[in-house]
Design a protein with these regions (language model features):
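Conserved alpha/beta catalytic core and glycan-binding cleft of carbohydrate-active enzymes
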Residues: 1-82, 89, 151-152, 157
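Carbohydrate-interacting/catalytic domains
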Residues: 60-65, 69-170
Length: 170
């Protein structure tokens, strides 16, 4: 999510436009982290990682979570023989209570996604944009809509169905 790290939602607008083109042909697997890159919480911080997760769960595609991201795991990928060790730690038998707040947010976003199954084919349309703030709507094939407000200055996200707030973080 370089658009969050670089504080440039115009980059995200371009990416979502390209993503819409993919959705015209197939439903892509979407992710914000994987086993080959520095962890999202390390790249953009834990609070900003929540904004990235909100995007992941409100755009078209099949969202995937890299284990530990839902707990805010950190890890820097390095360019050496053991460079993947920090991003691929053993999964603990029990999660730390320190990551519970992030896990609860992920659970809420997953629940929102499950309540709106049409999102997997949703196209996005940017309604308002500035470098550090963006509002877009995700529109399903049947005309269903959710509106997403992202703000990097306040580090906040709101997801609405019409006037009803479905999710809020700040």
């Amino acid at each position: 999510m370089s658009s969050i790290k670089e504080r440039n939602f115009f980059e995200l607008e371009w990416t979502l436009s390209r993503h819409n083109e993919f959705l015209d042909t197939f439903v892509p697997q979407t992710f914000i982290g994987n086993h080959d890159v520095t962890r999202i919480a390390t790249r953009i911080g834990q609070s900003n990682a929540i904004l990235a997760a909100a995007i992941l769960f409100t755009v078209g595609g099949t969202p995937s979570i890299y284990y530990g991201d839902e707990q805010g795991f950190t890890g820097l990928k390095e360019d050496n023989v053991f460079g993947d060790d920090a991003i691929r730690p053993p999964l603990p038998a029990e999660f730390s209570p320190l990551g519970t707040w992030i896990e609860n947010i992920y659970k809420a976003l997953i629940a929102l996604r499950r309540q709106h199954p049409w999102l997997y084919q949703a196209h996005t349309e940017v309604l308002e944009i500035a470098n550090e703030a963006m509002t877009y709507k995700s529109v399903g094939l049947g005309g269903e809509e959710l509106t997403v407000h992202l703000d990097l200055e306040e580090v906040s996200v709101r997801i609405l169905d019409g006037e009803k707030v479905l999710f809020q973080y700040s």
